[in-house]
């Protein structure tokens, strides 16, 4: 082996070897236990960022470790290739989304290869390929035939100037990002999949996901939002109309003082027809964004409709208000308001001077003070007629039973979860395979006409989708009848909801999935991705798996057994103020930094002399210009160093702070391993290790070696605390570096230790370990070498070091057999001259013995 560690030479050679040998190519092998490790597929944005590197390094470490355990390991990769950014980039660069996307895929693929990830490249998929989305279209038509798909009108952001639909991220301060025209809400027909039919399964099966983070499961439970309550029907005064509301708090029903309805509710529209002010309010609400995060924080506004609802139990007339916080898409589009016991209702009632009636006693039994806020806690009912004195549960049931008995109520389970709207009015996505015939009948595209191919050679104007702008594209026939194709495309979450299953059989052309391959590999054993995907992607991913199961394509209930959500990668952020006071962000690579003796930044400038403000550590992002290019780091230090730092600097689930000093430290460690191996091999071959005749020092070192193997095995396999595994190997390396190399057995022991160290580091730093394994004379390639197994016998201690105290002060240390009795330890202590002089001529009054650790002799 060469004397110096030169990663650029090693990594190129090893990667070429893997490519030629197809080391990571796998097929179904029923004689082996399978292991499917998957990292969430990347969007081909153009360049890898450190978040990608962290995600894929974690996946690669797990995959390589499992392969060393003798399992048949599948680790695939692909590209989530459709989506809005490609459209923007195409307009900006005067190209089409397809070539931009394919160029990016090629570039990023080479970046992944430079990092040494062990992917089966034969299984690579790009979701924009017709060979892929063909089966998604086919499956959608099958769901339609099963009644799982329907079309209804739904609100979108509409630019009246460009006459186009805008994604939420294209609406800036309520205006179109391109022309600055005020955006309107518009109802248009869209396709939905009935995820609500699976709400109970999605909720209940969370309990089977024992190896998913509790945080993700809680977020999904909240998103599904199962609640038990009552549907209540109110008559509308002086009208034949009825008004339906749903409540989870029937115990507060006697405290209803008004009813709020959505601006788009039939009663609002009816009243607005003769009330111009209300009509203006309805129009204003129609242009309000309906994202839940914004709904929660926006100002609550309303207007009286002049209509009244009749309380079914008291006969009271309750004013009906149109309110901007009630949505037609949610429930019945109407809510009963109990301002005494609901914070939002209280805020609205206070603003518009509506009555507030308490009907639940405070915890101390007193009437609650509602002057400053609502009392939302549950408690004993009062002010509620026949229900006074009941607790929450009894009150809930008594009111519900009464409403049911009167025929104005029905117990109901509701869900916060809404059906999945899969229509997007964009070009760069998979066409939705539906056709509207001449007579208005809507039918699925026949199977023999699939895939409905998205034309890729298009001109983007940045306004209208090319397939919407071209009337010829939509023309088709079904069974000889002319029709028009759907020009909306699928939400890109469709592609990422089933890609994991297609990886099991990417070339299969007789169906969506090859059942034999899919059921061999699925479910995924380990899924790795960010917590930001907890509710959208991970919910659709679970839902789609159940759809595949019910279509007979897979035979498991859940798509992934274990989920690891890696933390974000942070970096220093610096800026200076521009001439207009705007912040101009400077890359940390370009910041010239002064630090104090504790390493804290005290001053920073850039090459042009701007004094920089240090904004602390924040997530690497384009907006703050604080991303570190992985390629630059790989060229500077090598892929193994970058991978090692990524896995050592922080626990996988926690945020990782990018520090180049830490990268340098990882590089120094690999150089140290290389140097020790080089010095060792330079002395020639070693004799076999004679375990039976080791010295105490050699036994102790071997014990440390095998304890390290046991710890690293547990840390990598069960606990997934990769940083502590690396720390344990580093600690062992320190001991190996200090160990004497004077005898044949010293060298034989170092040979055993280095072969183990190289295998323990291999999942993290595969290139350097590949070379070291060869240099050390390891059998075959390290890619097929087994994981080291801790020798239980080696970890058993023959002797113990016991601290001896006299009257609580340490007077000596003695080595005794591990199984020595207290009497034997006392005798041995008496023979130790440093101890003996303190026992001369005194009486031992008391003995405190902690087996194998401490002997305290109390004398007087």
From Swiss-Prot:
InterPro entries for this protein: aa-tRNA-synth_I_CS, aa-tRNA-synth_Ia, Leu-tRNA-ligase, Leu_tRNA-synth_edit, M/V/L/I-tRNA-synth_anticd-bd, Methionyl/Leucyl_tRNA_Synth, Rossmann-like_a/b/a_fold, tRNAsynth_Ia_anticodon-bd
Superkingdom of origin organism: Bacteria
GO cellular component: cytosol
Motif 'KMSKS' region: chain residues: 619-623
Keyword list, A-Z: Aminoacyl-tRNA synthetase, ATP-binding, Cytoplasm, Ligase, Nucleotide-binding, Protein biosynthesis
Keyword Ubl conjugation: no
Pfam families per the UniProt record, alphabetical: Anticodon_1 (PF08264), tRNA-synt_1 (PF00133), tRNA-synt_1_2 (PF13603), tRNA-synt_1g (PF09334)
Binding annotation for ATP: 622
GO molecular function: aminoacyl-tRNA deacylase activity; ATP binding; leucine-tRNA ligase activity
The protein's Enzyme Commission number: 6.1.1.4
Localization in the cell: Cytoplasm
Catalytic activity of the protein: tRNA(Leu) + L-leucine + ATP = L-leucyl-tRNA(Leu) + AMP + diphosphate
GO biological process, one term: leucyl-tRNA aminoacylation
Positions occupied by motif 'HIGH' region: 42-52
Disulfide bond annotation, renumbered to this chain: none
PROSITE patterns tied to this protein: AA_TRNA_LIGASE_I
Family: Belongs to the class-I aminoacyl-tRNA synthetase family.
NCBIfam families: leuS_bact
HAMAP family: Leu_tRNA_synth_B (MF_00049_B)
Name of the protein in its database record: Leucine--tRNA ligase
Source organism of the structure: Yersinia enterocolitica serotype O:8 / biotype 1B (strain NCTC 13174 / 8081)
């Amino acid at each position: 082996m060469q004397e110096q560690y030169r990663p650029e030479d090693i990594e190129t050679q090893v990667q070429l070897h893997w490519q030629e040998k197809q080391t990571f190519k796998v097929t179904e092998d029923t004689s082996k236990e399978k292991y499917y490790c998957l990292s969430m597929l990347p969007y081909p944005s153009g360049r890898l960022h450190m978040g990608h590197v962290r995600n894929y390094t974690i996946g690669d470490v797990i995959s390589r470790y499992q392969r060393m355990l003798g399992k048949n390991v599948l680790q695939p990769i692909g590209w989530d290739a459709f989506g809005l950014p490609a459209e923007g980039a195409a307009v900006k660069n005067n190209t089409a989304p397809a070539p931009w996307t394919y160029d990016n895929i090629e570039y990023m693929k080479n970046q992944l290869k430079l990092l040494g990830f062990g992917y089966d490249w034969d299984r690579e998929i790009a979701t924009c390929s017709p060979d892929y989305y063909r089966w998604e279209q086919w499956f959608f038509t099958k769901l339609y035939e099963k009644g799982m798909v329907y079309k209804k009108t739904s609100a979108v952001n509409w630019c009246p100037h460009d006459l186009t639909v805008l994604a939420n991220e294209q609406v800036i301060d309520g205006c179109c990002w391109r022309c600055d025209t005020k955006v309107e809400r518009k109802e248009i027909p869209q396709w939905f999949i009935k995820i609500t039919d699976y709400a109970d399964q999605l909720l209940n099966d969370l309990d089977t996901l024992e190896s998913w983070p509790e945080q993700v499961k809680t977020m999904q439970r909240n998103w599904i939002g199962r609640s038990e309550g009552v549907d209540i029907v109110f008559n509308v005064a002086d009208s034949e109309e009825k008004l339906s509301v749903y409540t989870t708090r029937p115990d507060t029903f006697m405290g209803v003082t008004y009813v709020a309805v959505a601006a788009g509710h039939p009663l609002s529209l009816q009243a607005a027809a003769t009330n111009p002010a209300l009509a203006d309010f309805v129009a204003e609400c129609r242009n309000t964004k309906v994202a839940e995060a914004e709904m929660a924080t926006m100002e609550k506004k309303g207007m009286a409709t002049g209509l009244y609802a009749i309380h079914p139990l008291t006969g009271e007339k309750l004013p009906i208000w149109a309110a901007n916080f009630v949505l037609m898409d949610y429930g019945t589009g109407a809510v009963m308001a109990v301002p005494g016991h609901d914070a939002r209702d209280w805020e609205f009632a206070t603003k518009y001077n509506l009555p507030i009636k308490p009907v639940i006693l405070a915890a101390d039994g007193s009437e609650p003070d509602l002057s400053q806020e609502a009392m939302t806690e549950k408690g004993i009912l009062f002010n509620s007629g026949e229900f006074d004195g009941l607790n929450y549960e009894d009150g809930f049931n008594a009111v519900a039973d009464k409403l049911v008995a009167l025929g104005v109520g029905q117990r109901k389970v509701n869900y916060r979860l809404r059906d999945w709207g899969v229509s997007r009015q964009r070009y760069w996505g998979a066409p939705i395979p539906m056709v509207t015939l001449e007579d208005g009948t809507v039918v699925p595209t026949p199977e023999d006409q699939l895939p409905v191919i998205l034309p890729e050679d298009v001109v983007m104007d940045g306004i209208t989708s090319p397939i919407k702008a071209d009337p010829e594209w939509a023309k088709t026939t079904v069974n000889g009848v002319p029709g028009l194709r759907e020009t909306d495309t699928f939400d890109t979450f469709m592609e990422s909801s089933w890609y994991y299953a297609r990886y099991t059989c990417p070339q299969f052309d007789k169906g969506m999935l090859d059942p034999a391959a899919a059921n061999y590999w699925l479910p995924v054993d380990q899924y790795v991705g960010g917590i930001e995907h907890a509710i959208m992607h991970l919910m659709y991913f679970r839902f789609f798996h159940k759809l595949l199961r019910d279509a007979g394509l897979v035979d498991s209930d859940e798509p992934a057994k274990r989920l690891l959500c890696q933390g974000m990668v942070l970096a220093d952020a610096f800026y200076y103020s521009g001439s207009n006071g705007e912040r101009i962000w400077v890359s940390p690579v370009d910041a010239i930094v002064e630090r104090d003796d504790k390493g804290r930044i005290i001053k920073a400038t850039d090459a042009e002399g701007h004094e920089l403000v240090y904004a602390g550590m924040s997530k690497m992002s384009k907006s703050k210009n604080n991303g570190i290019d992985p390629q630059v780091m790989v060229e500077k230090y090598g892929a193994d160093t970058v991978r090692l730092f990524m896995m050592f600097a922080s626990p996988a689930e926690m945020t990782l702070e990018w520090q180049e000093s830490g990268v340098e430290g990882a590089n120094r460690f690999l150089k140290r391993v290389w140097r020790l191996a080089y010095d060792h091999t330079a002395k020639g071959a070693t004799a076999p290790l004679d375990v039976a005749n080791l010295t105490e020092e050699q036994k102790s070192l071997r014990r440390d070696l095998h304890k390290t193997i046991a710890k690293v095995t547990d840390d990598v396999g069960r606990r997934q605390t990769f940083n502590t595994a690396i720390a344990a190997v580093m600690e062992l390396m320190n001991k190996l570096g200090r160990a004497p190399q004077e005898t044949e057995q010293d060298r034989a022991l170092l040979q055993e230790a280095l072969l183990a160290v190289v295998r323990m580091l291999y999942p993290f730093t595969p290139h350097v370990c590949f070379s070291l394994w060869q240099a050390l004379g390891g059998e075959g390639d390290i890619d097929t070498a087994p994981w080291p197994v801790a020798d239980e016998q080696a970890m058993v201690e023959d002797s113990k070091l016991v601290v001896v105290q006299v009257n609580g002060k340490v007077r000596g240390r003695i080595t005794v057999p591990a199984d020595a009795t207290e009497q034997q330890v006392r005798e041995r202590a008496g023979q130790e001259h440093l101890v003996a002089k303190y026992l001369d001529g005194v009486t031992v009054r008391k003995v405190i013995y902690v087996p194998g650790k401490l002997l305290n002799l109390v004398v007087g």
